[in-house]
From Swiss-Prot:
This is Ubiquitin carboxyl-terminal hydrolase 44-A. The lineage of its organism: Eukaryota, Metazoa, Chordata, Craniata, Vertebrata. Zn(2+) 2 binds at C26, C29, C46, H53. Pfam families: UCH, zf-UBP. It comes from Xenopus laevis. The gene is usp44-a. The active site is at C283, H625.
Length: 690
C-alpha cells in the first residue's frame, strides 16, 4: 500500500521496547519466528502464520500498525496491507536504521538531522558491559526462579490436599502415621538409654573406687620419688611432644559434631532443567548450549576444568610481567608458587565475575606478578571458562532461568561472524564453537608449560581428548574401477554427517513435495550409496569408468546427524524442505559401516540411543526459531528447551518433531574397534597403481 492514513497519526516513543533485543520474542509463546512489534505500545507477539498473538492484540487494543522485527516490514491491520509510506517526521525510516544498527552492532549511521533513538544496547560490545542492565536481568532471573518455586510449592500443596481425600491417599497417610509413631517410640527409647548411661556415668565419677590394702601400699610414693617439675610438665604438654588423644565419644560431643556438619540441601529445581534467556535472536545459541550441557561426558569435563587462572598466568608470562627465578628450568613446574595465593586469586576472580558478568571486564593494573599477584592487567575472554561457569549454574539445581550474558560476549569477541542480533544457523554455530574451544585448549596446554601445574596440564589434555574424540569418526572413501576392479581407499575424518533428502523432496516453485514422511534410515542409505564417477575424474592408465562409495569405518561416541533442510533456490534464496523425517529412539549403524569394521566390532557398538534433537521452526533459512529436546538423566525424562520456557515431554513427542540436528549416543564404546589400519589406504585415489 503506497499511502496509509494511519501512519500519519503514528507517534513513536523513543524508549520503545523494540529497541531492546531481549524483547524480540513473542510474549505469549516465546517464539522468535515472525515476531511483530506493535508501534503504538510495547507489545511484541508472533504473526498470524504462527499462533496469531499479534492479531489478537490488535483485536483487543485496536492498535493498527505493527513492525516485523527481523524483516522490518510494517503492516496495517485496518488497511489489511503492508505499508510503504512514512510519517512526516520519518519515524519508520529512523526505526528501521536503528534496528539494523542494533542487529549488526554498528552505531555509526545517523540521520541528516542528527536525531537518533537510543537503545539499551549502547556502544562497545553491547549491553553486556552495562552493569545496570545485567543486574536488572539477574534480579529478574532470581524473581523468575522464586516464582517458579512458589508455584510448584502451591501446586504440590493442592495435590497433597486432594490426594489425602482419595482411598490410596488415606492409606498412604495411615502408613506414614504408623511409621512416625514407630520412629517416635525408637527415639524415646534411645533418649531413655542415653539418660540411663549419663546417670550411670555420673554415679561412677562421684564414687571413689575401692582398692585392696596391697594396691594402696604399692601406690604410696617412696621418699626418694621426685615430682615432675613445671618445666617438664610444660615440655610434656607442648605441641611438639603432645600425643594425639582420641576424639570425644560423649553424646554431647557427638551432637555437636552432627550439628556442625553441612546438610545437603534438596535442589530447588531438577539439575539441568534451567532455561536460558533469549538475549535477542539467540535461540540458536541457547539450543546448542542446552544440547552440550546434556551430553554427560562433555559436561563433566568442563565442570572440572576452569582455564581462568591458567590463562591469567599465561598472559602475564607472555607480556613479560611474571618473574621466574633462575633455579626453575624452562620445563619445570611451579605448584607451590602458583598455589600460594590461590584463595586470593579465586576471591578476586569471583568478585570481578559477579560485577562484570560471567567473564568479567578490564582492569588498568600493570603490576601482576607470579609470586605476589595483584589484580590482572586484563580479563581474558575464554569460551572454556564460560562453559564451565554456565554449566555450573545450569546443573546446580538452584536456578530456573539464567541469562548467558558472558557467553554471548565471548562468542562475539572470538567468533565475529555471530556478532550482533541477526538470526544465525545452529549447525554453523556448533561447528564454530567446537573449533574455537579446541583451539583454546591446544593453545593453553602448549604455552609456558612451566607455569601450569601438572594436574592442570593433565586435565587440559584429558578435556582436549574428549573434545577431539567425542564427535570424531572416520569415513572410508572407496573408489572401485569397473574395468580392472582395483579399489582405492581413503580415510577421511568427520565430526558430523550431513544427510541429503531424496530427490522426490526437492521441488521448485509451487510444486508440492511428497507428503509421505522421509525415513532417517533412507537418508543414511543415500549417504552411503554407490555413485558413478563420470568423465575423467578417476584417472587410470587403462580405464576411466569407476564408482565411489562412502562408508563409516570408525564410529564416534556421539553421532551428529545434520539434516540438510535448506537448499538453494535461485541465486540468492535458500528455501526449507519442511517434510517430516521419521527417526527412532534407537539407531543401528551396522548397515552403513564397511564390512571389515563389522567383523571386528561387537554387535553392541553399532547401537546408538537418541539423546538430543535440535528443531528449526519456520519456513526460511534467514528466519525462524530454534528449540531443543534433551534427555535429562537426573530426572529420567525428556525436556523441551524453548529458551526460558522448559517443560517435560514424552519420547513420542520427541519423535514427532521436525528435526534439524540429531544426536545419538553410542550404547557401548570400544576404542580399538575400527579397522582403518587394516585397509589399504592411498593418499590420492586419482592415481592408483597398475
Amino acid at each position: 500500500m503506497d499511502k496509509c492514513k494511519h501512519v500519519g497519526r503514528l507517534r513513536l516513543a523513543q524508549d520503545h521496547s523494540i529497541l531492546n533485543p531481549q524483547k524480540w520474542h513473542c510474549v505469549d509463546c516465546n517464539t522468535t519466528e515472525s515476531v511483530w512489534a506493535c508501534l503504538s505500545c510495547s507489545h511484541v507477539a508472533c504473526g498470524r502464520y504462527i499462533e496469531e498473538h499479534a492479531l489478537r492484540h490488535f483485536q483487543d487494543s485496536k492498535h493498527p500498525l505493527a513492525l516485523e522485527v527481523n524483516e522490518l516490514y510494517v503492516f496495517c491491520y485496518l488497511c489489511d496491507d503492508y505499508v510503504l509510506n512514512d510519517n512526516t517526521t520519518g519515524d519508520l525510516k529512523l526505526l528501521r536504521s536503528t534496528l539494523s544498527a542494533i542487529k549488526s552492532q554498528n552505531y555509526d549511521c545517523t540521520t541528516r538531522s542528527g536525531r537518533t533513538l537510543r537503545s539499551m544496547v549502547t556502544a562497545d560490545d553491547s549491553f553486556i558491559s552495562h552493569e545496570g542492565a545485567q543486574a536488572f536481568l539477574q534480579n529478574e532471573d532470581r524473581a523468575f526462579t522464586a516464582l517458579w518455586h512458589r508455584r510448584h510449592a502451591l501446586l504440590g500443596k493442592v495435590f497433597r490436599s486432594w490426594f489425602a481425600l482419595t482411598p490410596k491417599g488415606k492409606q498412604r497417610l495411615e502408613e506414614e502415621r504408623l511409621r512416625e509413631e514407630a520412629e517416635q517410640k525408637r527415639e524415646e527409647a534411645r533418649k531413655k538409654r542415653q539418660q540411663l548411661k549419663r546417670k550411670l556415668k555420673e554415679e561412677m565419677e562421684s564414687t571413689s573406687p575401692r582398692k585392696s590394702s596391697r594396691l594402696q601400699h604399692q601406690i604410696q610414693p617412696s621418699p626418694k620419688t621426685e615430682l615432675p617439675s613445671v618445666q617438664k610438665m610444660n615440655q610434656k604438654n607442648s605441641p611438639t611432644t603432645k600425643q594425639k588423644t582420641p576424639a570425644p565419644t560423649s553424646d554431647k560431643a557427638c551432637f555437636k559434631k552432627i550439628g556442625n556438619s553441612p546438610i545437603k540441601r534438596k535442589p530447588t529445581v531438577t539439575p539441568g532443567v534451567t532455561g536460558l534467556r533469549n538475549l535477542g535472536n539467540t535461540c540458536y545459541m541457547n539450543s546448542i548450549l542446552q544440547i552440550l550441557s546434556h551430553l554427560h561426558v562433555f559436561r563433566e569435563c568442563f565442570l572440572q576444568l576452569d582455564l581462568n587462572q591458567t590463562q591469567e598466568l599465561l598472559a602475564a608470562a607472555g607480556s613479560g610481567k611474571t618473574r621466574l627465578s633462575s633455579k626453575y628450568p624452562p620445563g619445570a613446574e611451579l605448584p607451590r608458587v602458583t598455589q600460594k595465593h590461590t584463595k586470593v586469586q579465586r576471591s578476586l576472580a569471583r568478585r570481578q565475575s559477579f560485577s562484570l558478568g560471567l567473564s568479567g571486564g578490564a582492569s588498568n593494573s600493570r603490576n601482576m606478578e607470579l609470586i605476589q599477584p595483584k589484580e590482572p592487567s586484563s580479563k581474558h575472554i575464554s569460551l572454556c571458562h564460560e562453559l564451565h561457569t554456565l554449566f555450573q549454574v545450569m546443573w546446580s539445581g538452584k536456578w530456573a532461568l539464567v541469562s548467558p550474558f558472558a557467553m554471548l560476549h565471548s562468542v562475539w569477541r572470538l567468533i565475529p561472524a555471530f556478532r550482533g542480533y541477526a538470526q544465525q544457523d545452529a549447525q554453523e554455530f556448533l561447528c564454530e564453537l567446537l573449533d574455537k574451544v579446541q583451539q583454546e585448549l591446544e593453545t593453553t596446554g602448549t604455552r609456558y608449560p612451566a607455569l601450569i601445574p601438572t594436574s592442570q596440564r593433565k586435565l587440559i589434555k584429558q578435556v582436549l581428548n574428549v573434545v577431539n574424540n567425542i564427535f570424531h569418526g572416520q569415513l572410508l572413501s572407496q573408489v572401485t574401477c569397473l574395468v580392472c576392479d582395483h579399489k582405492s581407499n581413503t580415510i577421511e575424518p568427520f565430526w558430523d554427517l550431513s544427510l541429503e533428502f531424496p530427490e522426490r523432496y526437492h521441488f521448485n516453485g509451487k510444486e508440492t513435495a511428497s507428503q509421505r514422511p522421509c525415513l532417517l534410515t533412507e537418508m543414511l542409505a543415500k549417504f552411503t550409496e554407490t555413485e558413478a564417477l563420470e568423465g575423467k575424474i578417476y584417472a587410470c592408465d587403462q580405464c576411466n569408468k569407476a564408482q565411489k562409495q562412502l562408508m563409516v569405518c570408525r564410529l564416534p561416541q556421539v553421532l551428529r546427524l545434520h539434516l540438510k533442510r535448506f537448499r538453494w533456490s535461485g541465486r540468492n534464496h535458500r528455501e526449507k524442505i519442511g517434510v517430516h523425517v521419521r527417526f527412532d529412539q534407537m539407531l543401528n549403524m551396522e548397515p552403513y559401516c564397511c564390512r571389515e569394521s563389522t567383523a571386528a566390532l561387537r554387535a553392541d557398538c553399532f547401537i546408538y540411543d537418541l539423546s538430543s534433537v535440535v528443531m528449526h521452526h519456520g519456513k526460511g533459512f534467514g528466519s525462524g526459531h530454534y528449540t531443543a529436546f534433551c534427555y535429562n538423566p537426573e530426572g529420567g525424562f525428556w525436556v523441551h528447551c524453548n529458551d526460558s520456557k522448559l517443560h517435560s515431554c514424552t519420547v513420542e513427542e520427541v519423535c514427532k518433531a521436525q528435526a534439524y540436528i540429531l544426536f545419538y549416543t553410542q550404547r557401548v564404546t570400544q576404542e580399538n574397534g575400527h579397522l582403518s589400519d587394516t585397509l589399504p589406504v592411498h593418499g590420492s585415489p586419482q592415481s592408483p597403481p597398475r
